[in-house]
Amino acid sequence: MIWIALSFLFFTVMVAVISAWKTRDDKLDTAEGYFLAGRGLPGIVIAGSLLLTNLSAEQLVGTNGQGWASNMSPIGWEVGALFTLFALALWFLPTYLKMGTTTIPQLMEARFGRGTKLMFSFVIVVMYSILNLPVILYSGAVVFENIFDISGIFGISKFTAVAILCVVIGIIGGCYAIFGGLKAVAVSDTINGIGLIIGGLMIPFLALALLGHETTGGGLVEGVKYLVQAEPEKLNAWASWDAAEPALPWPLIFTGMFFNNLYWWCTNQSFVQRALAAKSLKEGQKGAIYCGFLKTIGFFYLVLPGVIAYHLPSIQDKLAAAGSSAIDFAYPALVSAVVPKPVMGFFAAVLFGAILSSFNSVLNSASTMFTLDLYRTAINPKASDMQCVKVGKIYGTCAGAVAICVAPFVMFAQGITTFLNSMSQFVSLPILFTVLGALIFRKAPKYAPKVITAVHVIAYGAFMIIKPCYPTSGEPIHYLYAIAVLFVVEFAIMWYLNKYRGTEEYVPADVGAVDLTPWKYRHIVCIIGIILAIGIYILFSPIGIAA
């Protein structure tokens, strides 16, 4: 127990010390220095920060749970991100950096006017502050509690354990985001990302070795053989078109999921802000493309362990006892069974770092958007950089404090995570098409985003209320089918407005913020990534190991 605590503290403190050292000479009293790390992030740091912004503890448990409950089809969330990260690198980022974009709403204002900027800024800041932050804290605390049994160790109730964890995570994460700015967040993300890859990849290898030992008396190789031969359909990444959640129907890989990923990876502020802080277009493209490769191998620690847990004999009693909640306990049970005690402290620190990264990334983005898109636009247009940094710190402190107070009580709001995911879809495509107005639909009138938003909210709201079902199975239709249909409809509307109601063509201004020379190897590396993704889907298919 002492060794676990010491190794946990060592890694956690090491991350904090390195982050403080790397930001010791930064100018955090300017808006660009505080909110965009002085536009000085290299590609490797951008890649690590993008990865950790996306990867939450809830995702680690939830996606593995999906693999346990269905098959390998949830790898679509990981492998599919490769293509949208390439889109960010090749098409979105050059325009963002050319315009000197700090926040996505700033681009919206340049293209469609102040009203559009304020509308989306207000909605996004409210969602980040009221919904995302408390849920990130709560879900992270619950995952940590489920894996490491904090309540059992200290003899306290689960609610108390979750509340304490929320306070600890909130305070530490808030310190990174509020006092260190974006660079401190990005540096800590990079170190935690390295730890996560090491710790995360350790789990399937240990699990396969234990599977081989428990089933045949062998080791790792026997575990792999058993996994492939025992139930091959569990290794199939191609779910039927009418598969129920948590499986991912195969048509959505190319439609709804791709469009959803375009929003998250290419237009969502908490993700894109890391790339906007690049020291050059070359480094920004490297970061996005590197992250694409990291996401492609993500299924090794985000889906495969769940499939292994389905087969591992020693944890089946625990999962059976969990009943309907077994999907959320598959990964914690596997970790408890396979991670050696001397390594558990390191793994706990890695998981703690992933939770911190999710929280401080969203907190930093909420603070950035509130300050630059609401305060400086609507409240105090003449605010100096120093005033903006001060307001950003005050808002970040208040938002963090509210999240800490609210987070433990999310326990009593059933289905809050599903509700949060559903709410994000109400703004995903409208934001995406507003940004596309600066990239593709350059003649669309200024009222176009409002038309798209109205159509999307009404149509998606109707889908959520009616909850249509598949005619074949009677199961609810996957929400990404609705996103796929709405993307086509809204694209057609935007095309019509651009073609027949268009105004003078918009030309993005070049403000000379950074060097816009692209990475010369970007195309060949992207082609290699696409070949890798195709190879993975062939491997996990009926013509591969899922025969």
Label every model-predicted segment:
Residues M1, G38-R39, V45, G62-G76, ...:
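Loop-to-helix junctions at membrane interfaces in multi-pass transport proteins
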Residues E32, T101-P105, E109, T116, ...:
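Hydrophobic, small-residue-rich membrane helices and short re-entrant helix-turn-helix hairpins
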Residues V15, L51, S73-I178, G256-W264, ...:
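Helix-loop-helix module between adjacent transmembrane segments
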Residues I2-A5, G65-E78, V135-L165, K183-N192, ...:
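Transmembrane helix-loop boundary segments of multi-pass membrane transporters
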Residues R114-L118, S129, F159-V167, T371-Q414, ...:
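Loop-to-transmembrane helix boundary motifs in multi-pass membrane proteins
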Residues M1-L60, G180, F205:
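Membrane-interface "cap" regions at the ends of multi-pass membrane proteins
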Residues D26, Y470-A547:
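Terminal cytosolic tails of multi-pass membrane transporters
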Residues L196, A448-Y460:
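Central hydrophobic cores of alpha-helical transmembrane segments
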